[in-house]
Amino acid sequence: MIVVTGGAGFIGANIIHALNLRGETDILVVDDLTDGTRFRNLAELDVTDYMDKGEFLERVKANDLPMGIRAVFHEGACSDTTEWDGKFMMENNYTYSKVLLHWCLDRKVPFLYASSAAVYGASDEFREERECERPLNVYGYSKWQFDQYVRKILPSARSQIVGFRYFNVYGPREQHKGKMASVAYHLHEQIKAGQNPKLFEGWDGYSDGGQQRDFVYVDDVCKVNLWFYDNPEQSGIFNLGTGRAQSFLDVAQAVIRYHGKGSVEFIPFPDELKGRYQSFTQADITALRDVGYTAEFADVASGVESYLAWLDR
């Protein structure tokens, strides 16, 4: 059995889909379906069982999980970068992760988990090194602190531990995220509603719509996850992006090209985001390449086209 926490969420559901494509259905989904609309991501997937996150955590602590767990993909977290309840964030993203990590280590079960590019925050360098890590919000801090915890354990670990610092992931099965869904999704919805796509005006030295991020298609994220699953001798913390920064304007142009209509409107940059916003990210994927991952990553033009076609299927 494979455990996927956050399995009803964006990346978790896509990992399950990728496993299903391999014929793997012996999967335990762990999530919180208090928001019942999130069932939609699971309805098209094949899994063995579902367990509420609270029950799962209690059973982890009580050593009462099913036998034969072969790997844990730990995608469950609060990923809202605007959430400032630090106690809530640390319980969900740090303490929960530590408990599950030690359960896996005690049983030599591979543990593959979601970190985040938010650990870099205000940095203008994006290497998996301490001097590059300057989180701007408590979400980024919660992910960074768990990475720090993992770093201390890695040298003595006797089973696989892999952390993925996800950059700006977009693609199928993110619709439930609301305001935290990708810019590609929101621009697509705006054009469908008869509006022009809207981007922020320039800020922090960038032109209108010129802020740049490393936008990575979720299919590529799943491929990297499964490559490490297939190579359990590889451990570490790795950036998971394309290694290529592209502007929000590039995303808007890809959406406009798909629809064949629309022109970008620029809106004022929100005061509440000033000083808390990453205007530029670009993954340094040297470490990922050094361990043997060779596949290429989709650029914005091809990734957005595939994504919008999926949304309109």
UniProtKB/Swiss-Prot annotation:
Listed EC numbers: 5.1.3.20
Cofactor comment text: Binds 1 NADP(+) per subunit.
GO biological process annotation, one example: carbohydrate metabolic process
Keywords, comma-separated and alphabetical: Carbohydrate metabolism, Isomerase, NADP
Statement: the UniProt record of this protein carries the keyword Manganese: no
Reaction(s) the record says it catalyses: ADP-D-glycero-beta-D-manno-heptose = ADP-L-glycero-beta-D-manno-heptose
Subunit-level organization: Homopentamer.
Protein name: ADP-L-glycero-D-manno-heptose-6-epimerase
Source organism: Marinobacter nauticus (strain ATCC 700491 / DSM 11845 / VT8) (Marinobacter aquaeolei)
